[in-house]
Amino acid sequence: MADTKPLHQTRFEAAVSVIQSLPKNGSFQPSNEMMLKFYSFYKQATLGPCNTPRPGFWDPVGRYKWDAWNSLGDMSKEDAMIAYVDEMKKILETMPVTEKVEELLQVIGPFYEIVEDKKHGRGSGVTSELGSVLTSTPNGKAVNGKAESSDSGAESDEEQAATKEVREEDEEEESEHSEQEDKDVEQQPGHEKPAESIVNGLTRNHRELVTEEPTPLPSKCLSEPGDKVAIPDTHSPVNDPEADREEDCTEDIAAMQHLTSDSDSEIFCDSMEQFGQDEADHSLLLQDAMLNGDITETSAGGELKDGGEDGKQSGHGAQRKTWSEKSEHFGSRRERPSRMQPGGDGSRSGQIGSGGDGDRWGSDRGPNGSLNEQIAVVLMRLQEDMQNVLQRLHSLEVQTASQAQFLLRESNNQPMEKKPSRWPFGISPGTLALAVVWPFVVHWLMHVFLQKRRRKQT
């Protein structure tokens, strides 16, 4: 008959015998919660669902047992036996090895080895799934021309071929994208081709920013002896060679340095917000480079004057002051020291326009003027806010001082507190005297009443 028992019942009986054989004062003492679990599973496995009424309040232990048994609901006997054995497996390592425990281990079998096999199989499955994902992904990412992979040494020929195809596709997409951008720029009305040569330390990578200026630069600059770079003025109505030579602004190429931005080495942009931030950085670089190069441009007349004439009066000093202020501003904006070169002699420093007002350099053209106006507006608003804050602080200080004075006056105007009475009792003396005297008064009245009554009887 023992052979016909199911396996879960045999394991259940062995586990029950182990629990019943535990000594009361042994080394292993299960907790009350654990014993409640074993009790509920045992009752469910032997008697089925709980149908007995709940014990009364005088039996708290029975009530706890009944609650644990009733919480199992309609669990079947087989499930209760299996759950009982599972709970036994959790504490089997902490129990001392006895004959009953050895019998239970023989009935349960080597469950530790089965767990290890499951872990090993699960890890190999994850590895195989990861390998299949890596090999079956058609759209692999290529960052800076290098494909991402988990193990480059273990790639097969097919993976290498797929990676090569992905690289070629990405390169073709990039080239098509750049060509399409160039075509769109060329098709814009009233647009001229930007300068390809170095303009004040800016290379062709910044041609989009150069074209945003109202004065586009031609692709060809006149070169003069001494390594000079000429920047013609396109505002002049007549392209006269002599006027061009007078309007050219020469500058040493050795003094020019290539300006690099934080995003020169970044090819890919994560979002449009980053792209807009890069454009703002490039615009700041362009303005900073124009300040550092000491470039002087003509106004609508296109006339450049040397510092030997009118530059000594107002243009030279004011222009140096304005450039120093702007260079300090841009240096603080980009969190680096300004690289503006000090103004040289009169031949190197020119003035703008026929009026010779160097303070208006760039105020009516390009984003520089709007930037200065925005800065001025922000400073004015900040000053107003600071004044409001100071006024509020002053009003708070005045209110605090007035409140302190008011409290001081109130404390002075309060009458002097009465000295504590020396009477030891909590009641007044009159009340105490009345309480002591009234029994005698009542007794005297009763005595008088009784005497009158006796007289009447006699």
From Swiss-Prot:
It is found in: Peroxisome membrane. One of its GO terms (molecular function) is fatty-acyl-CoA binding. GO terms for biological process: pexophagy. Keywords: Autophagy, Coiled coil, Lipid-binding, Membrane, Peroxisome, Transmembrane, Transmembrane helix, Transport. Residues 8-97 form the ACB domain. It comes from the Eukaryota. GO terms for cellular component: peroxisomal membrane. Gene3D superfamilies: 1.20.80.10. It is a single-pass membrane protein. InterPro entries: ACBD5 (IPR016347), Acyl-CoA-binding_prot_CS (IPR022408), Acyl-CoA-binding_protein (IPR000582), Acyl-CoA-binding_sf (IPR035984), FERM/acyl-CoA-bd_prot_sf (IPR014352). Residues 125-139 have a biased composition (Polar residues). An acyl-CoA binds at residues 19-28, 39-43, 65, 84. The keyword Acyltransferase does not apply. Residues 154-188, 373-402 form a coiled coil. Residues 119-248, 296-369 are annotated as: Disordered. SUPFAM superfamilies: Acyl-CoA binding protein. Residues 343-356 have a biased composition (Gly residues). Its main location: membrane. The chain crosses the membrane at residues 430-450. Residues 177-195, 303-313, 322-338 have a biased composition (Basic and acidic residues). Acyl-CoA binding protein which acts as the peroxisome receptor for pexophagy but is dispensable for aggrephagy and nonselective autophagy. Binds medium- and long-chain acyl-CoA esters. PANTHER family: ACYL-COA-BINDING DOMAIN-CONTAINING PROTEIN 5 (PTHR23310:SF6), ACYL-COA-BINDING PROTEIN, ACBP (PTHR23310). Belongs to the ATG37 family. This is Acyl-CoA-binding domain-containing protein 5. It comes from Xenopus tropicalis (Western clawed frog). The lineage of its organism: Eukaryota, Metazoa, Chordata, Craniata, Vertebrata.
